[in-house]
Curated annotation (Swiss-Prot):
Pfam families, A to Z: C2_SYDE, RhoGAP
Boundaries of every Rho-GAP domain copy: 398-604
Region span, Disordered: 1-255, 601-654, 675-708
Gene Ontology cellular component list: cerebellar mossy fiber; cytosol; presynapse; synaptic membrane
Disulfide bond positions: none
Modified residues (Phosphoserine): 224, 231, 235, 244, 575, 683, 685
Protein name as catalogued: Rho GTPase-activating protein SYDE1
Chain's role: GTPase activator for the Rho-type GTPases. As a GCM1 downstream effector, it is involved in placental development and positively regulates trophoblast cells migration. It regulates cytoskeletal remodeling by controlling the activity of Rho GTPases including RHOA, CDC42 and RAC1.
Length: 737
């Protein structure tokens, strides 16, 4: 009778009998959950109830062990009883070991949780005595959580599903963690070393040694794991006590040393020890602080959020920064502002790197922060490099005499000036805005580098540099960066004396007299300035096209060719401010160059302009009006009104000519098919008139404004009016300061 019952019992334990899941597990799992030795059936339910209460598992609907079953087990032979009771595994194997078919669950179900959830909160301390009485005395509890009884098979009677079984496994983690901590030493490192090799704790680092600040230790005298702050630095843990203030040298940047003369190259190791003297306002709550490090205004490193203390905040962070031409190291202390939900600077300090490493490689400084506080840090400079040698100027910034000797250029004029002037005179004399518009900065940088490498190999053709403003910009940059200006101090005084004699007159000075003003200059400067004055005089002769009159040329080149500050021609009675003095000097520069351009002989006047005559403005030749033999009622025109806003460009020359026949106009129907782009753009169409043989008639815009709109009226009439206005506005106005 015993053998069939035993066989049936083991078949249920191993899951070989396929019964309804909820009922079979609730009934059959209660049998092997017994102690390894027979005990009376009465006291064990009480202990089991206490263990279930400690583990926070709801009681089973039916009693796990009845007196009948206990009597049955006692009636068995000792070997059979041990065989029946040996099917239950120890608690350690249930928690740690892999699941086997003898565990009472289906063989094919494997549940794996790589990152367990957080531990549940410990229960109230009232049932602590009953739990300790029912569990084995293995030592004090370090984490402060109430220990639970060893898990048994009866704890799964209410967990038929996999989710419930997984939650029960998660509830066993506090007990497992407690047992592992009791078996190991008290330090975090030994705890990691003695953890089982296959345990989840050691594999996924669930028991971290980095705690939160202010973690209280439990009774028994055992201290909590060593706390620290994780940050961007190399040392996330805080040392024991504050550093000694006497070990750090006070440092504060003086107002006169904020612009150091040199730079620093190398590797800087910065170790932060702490922040002191940051006294919060009375009644203020502690704030989260972080330290931001900047090198020459660029953020390079920062710490994590740190909870500020009453007077001193301990730090232990190390940063390694690569320095390239570094001068200033700035430390910003940022405080969290809950109003705007971001960090705001509350203190800052500056360190001049080139000055602190003179004669040493390491410094321990107490950097003074503004408005309050100190930053205790150690700065170590390693792998210091010498400053790279500055490239020697080959064209820009080189003295004129030295550049001419190096290039051996003909005429004692640098190649860059000859090439730029040649291209401007070839294709830029009729460009509006010459020397006043700026070209592309990137293209200018490319052209500058090309001149620095090899001036003779630079090609300034229109295919390579189509924008003439790039070439004019390079020429002005070169003249501006000369070590000595072309119009020197002696020449400046000579021109001022000539200006004191009266208005420049070619009859009084003559060509040789004006050129004789440059005799005080050296040969190279005299040849270069002569070439530039000839060029500017030629540019001003095309002022009808490029709007570069001698006055405009003097405004553009006066500050470039003359020094920044000249000695005044007569002493002033009283000193003025620096702004007034600079304005007066700037005005004198323009007057000196304007005098030279007006009195300079024009040897290269354009051939289309007669000698001694002023080039006229662009005004179309006045011709008789065109009279068409049209009847009055057959022509419908729309004359332009005198008042009202100007019509848009698309309707500027609008008119209804649909009633006109093809025999009335010489251009025929083609004229009515589209807009007259030739006349709108103001292009020269005199050749077309010569071919057709018809005289080209234009209406005088000034005399016959009320006349009907003429089809041959073009934009040149408007250009003539605009040029007249510009001529009146460009008249010289003498301003006396």
């Amino acid at each position: 009778m015993a053998e069939p019952l035993l066989r049936k019992t083991f078949s249920r334990l191993r899951g070989r009998e396929k019964l309804p899941r909820k009922k079979s597990e609730a009934k059959d799992r209660g049998h092997p959950a017994q102690r390894s030795e027979p005990k009376p059936p009465e006291p064990e339910p009480r202990v089991l109830e206490g263990s279930q209460a400690g583990a926070e598992v709801p009681p089973s609907p039916e009693t796990p062990r009845s007196p009948t079953r206990g009597a049955y087990l006692q009636s068995l032979e000792p070997s059979s009883r041990r065989w029946v009771l040996g099917g239950a595994k120890p608690p350690e194997e249930i928690s740690l070991g892999p699941r086997t078919p003898s565990s009472g669950e289906p063989a094919g179900e494997i549940w794996y949780n790589p990152i367990p959830e957080e531990d549940p909160r410990p229960p109230a301390p009232e049932p602590l005595g009953s739990q300790l009485a029912s569990s084995e005395p293995e030592g004090p509890n370090i984490q402060g959580a109430a220990p639970t009884s060893p898990p048994t098979k009866t704890s799964r009677t209410k967990s038929p599903g996999p989710a419930r079984r997984l939650s029960m496994k998660m509830k066993k983690l506090p007990e497992l963690r407690r047992r592992l901590s009791l078996r190991s030493t008290r330090t975090g490192r030994d705890r990691e070393r003695t953890a089982p090799a296959g345990s989840v704790i050691s594999r996924y680092r669930l028991d971290s040694s980095v705690g939160t600040p202010g973690q209280a230790s439990v009774a028994g005298g055992s201290r909590s794991p060593r706390g620290g702050y994780l940050s961007d630095g190399d040392s996330p843990e805080r040392p024991g006590g504050p550093p000694s203030p006497t070990a750090f040298r006070p440092y504060e940047v003086g107002p006169s040393a904020r612009t150091p003369p040199a730079a620093l190259w190398g590797r800087l190791s910065l170790h932060l020890y702490g922040l002191g003297g940051l006294r919060p306002s009375p009644g203020a709550t502690p704030r989260d602080l972080c330290c931001l490090l900047q090198v020459d205004g660029v953020a390079r490193a920062r710490t994590g959020p740190l909870r500020s203390g009453p007077d001193f905040l301990r730090l232990d962070h190390t940063f390694h920064l690569e320095l390239e031409a570094a001068r200033l190291l700035r430390a910003l202390v940022l405080a969290w502002d809950p109003g705007v939900r971001r960090h705001r600077p509350c203190a800052q300090g500056t360190v001049l790197l080139p000055t602190i490493f003179r004669g040493c490689q390491a410094q321990q400084l107490a950097v003074r922060l503004e408005p309050q506080g100190f930053l205790y840090a150690k700065l170590t400079l390693s792998e210091q490099q010498e400053a790279p040698a500055t490239a020697e100027p080959r064209v820009f910034g080189l003295p004129l005499q030295l550049l001419v000797e190096r290039e051996q250029s003909p005429g004692q004029v640098p190649l860059i000036i000859r090439k730029c002037v040649g291209q401007i005179e070839c294709r830029g004399l009729r460009v509006v805005g010459l020397y006043r518009l700026c070209g592309s900065a990137a293209v200018k940088k490319e052209l500058r580098d090309a001149f620095e490498q090899d001036s003779a190999a630079v090609c300034l053709s229109e295919d390579v540099y189509p924008d003439i403003n790039v070439i004019t910009g390079i020429l002005k940059d070169y003249l501006r960066e000369l070590p000595t200006p072309l119009i020197t101090q002696p020449l400046y005084q000579v021109v001022l004396e000539a200006m004191a004699q009266g208005h420049p007159s070619r009859a009084s000075l003559g060509p040789e007299g004006t050129r004789g003003l440059l005799r005080c200059l050296p040969d190279v400067e005299r040849a270069t300035l002569t070439l530039l004055l000839d060029h500017l005089r030629l540019v001003s002769s095309f002022h009808t096209h490029n709007r570069m009159t001698p006055q405009n040329x003097a405004v553009c080149f006066g500050p470039v060719l003359l020094p920044a500050r000249q000695t005044p021609s007569r002493p002033r009675l009283r000193s003025s401010g620096p702004g007034v003095t600079s304005a007066v000097d700037f005005k004198r520069h323009i007057e000196v160059l304007h005098y030279l351009l007006q009195s300079w002989p024009d040897t290269r006047r354009p051939s289309d302009t007669p000698d001694g005559a002023v080039a006229p403005y662009l005004r179309p030749k006045r011709q008789p009006p065109l009279h068409l033999p049209l009847a009055g009622p057959e022509v419908v025109t729309r004359p332009r009104g005198r008042g009202g806003p100007e019509s848009p460009p698309s309707n500027r020359y609008a008119g209804d000519w649909s009633v006109c026949g093809g025999d009335l106009l010489p251009c025929g129907r083609d004229f009515l098919s589209g807009p007259d782009y030739d006349h709108v753009t103001g292009s020269d169409s005199e050749e077309d008139d010569d071919e057709t043989g018809e005289p080209r008639g234009t209406t005088d815009f000034e005399d016959e404004f009320d006349a009907p709109f003429n089809p041959h009226l073009n934009l040149k009439d408007f250009d003539a009016l605009i040029l007249d206005l510009e001529r009146e506005l460009s008249k010289q106005i003498n301003v006396c300061l």
